[in-house]
């Protein structure tokens, strides 16, 4: 925080071991940190994501998104979230319904801004056509080992629509440090 990095980005699914335990664990841990030092809350931009349900796998229905956001807030012990993102596209929920969930959360003062994570360009455009509260972010996987957003139109869409691109896994899941699964010539350049 003292270096100016104030975005704290988490998700309800972070901490899940996919064996059925740990859902919400990272948000709970962050909640303990914020409870131990409440002054931190005013120094961070809090971002979280929802919409992944183990075994389903995705649910972006208005009822689920609203309840997932409220549950995230309880786990973190906060009364509002600056940025809430849909974690992955749900093919079975119409973008109009997602937009309605965003409007409801914003209208209640629970969330300031909204975005998407792991959405294609066309999925983002479909949601943009329905939102009342504008999207502000798109969060693709993006690193020097994963350059697809430069080629698939994601970064172009961000520029066109004024979305902030938030890279997830910018260090390629740690592989840039270890070299595992990375082309040797890229590792040589990074070293």
Model feature map: region roles:
Residues 1-44:
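N-terminal binding-site loop/beta-alpha segment at the start of enzyme catalytic domains
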Residues 2, 31-45, 70-77, 104-106, ...:
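Acidic (Asp/Glu)-rich catalytic clusters
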Residues 8, 81, 114:
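Glycine-centered flexible beta-alpha turn that most often forms the glycine-rich phosphate-binding loop
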Residues 14-19, 53-58, 174-178:
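A short acidic, helix-capping loop that chelates divalent metal ions and anchors anionic groups
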Residues 42-54, 141-142:
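A short, structured active-site edge motif that brings together acidic residues
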Residues 50-66, 87-93:
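Active-site mouth loops of central-metabolism enzymes
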Residues 73-92:
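Active-site groove signature of glycoside hydrolases
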Residues 89-191:
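Beta/alpha (TIM)-barrel catalytic core signal, keyed to glycine-rich beta->alpha loops juxtaposed to Asp/Glu
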């Amino acid at each position: 925080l003292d270096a100016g990095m104030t975005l704290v980005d988490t998700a309800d699914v972070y901490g899940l071991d996919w064996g059925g335990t740990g859902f919400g664990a990272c948000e709970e841990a962050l909640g303990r940190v914020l409870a131990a030092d409440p002054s931190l809350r005013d120094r961070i931009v809090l971002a979280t994501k929802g919409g992944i349900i183990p075994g389903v796998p995705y649910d972006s229905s208005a009822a689920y998104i609203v309840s997932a956001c409220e549950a995230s807030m309880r786990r973190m012990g906060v009364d509002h979230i600056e940025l809430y993102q849909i974690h992955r596209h749900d093919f079975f929920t119409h973008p109009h319904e997602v937009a309605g969930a965003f409007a409801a959360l914003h209208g209640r003062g629970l969330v300031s801004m909204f975005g998407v994570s792991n959405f294609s360009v066309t999925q983002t455009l479909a949601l943009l056509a329905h939102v009342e509260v504008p999207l502000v972010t798109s969060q693709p996987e993006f690193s020097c080992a994963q350059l697809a957003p430069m080629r698939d139109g994601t970064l172009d869409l961000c520029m066109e629509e004024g979305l902030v691109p938030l890279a997830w896994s910018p260090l390629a899941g740690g592989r840039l440090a270890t070299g595992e699964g990375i082309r040797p010539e890229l590792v040589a350049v990074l070293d």
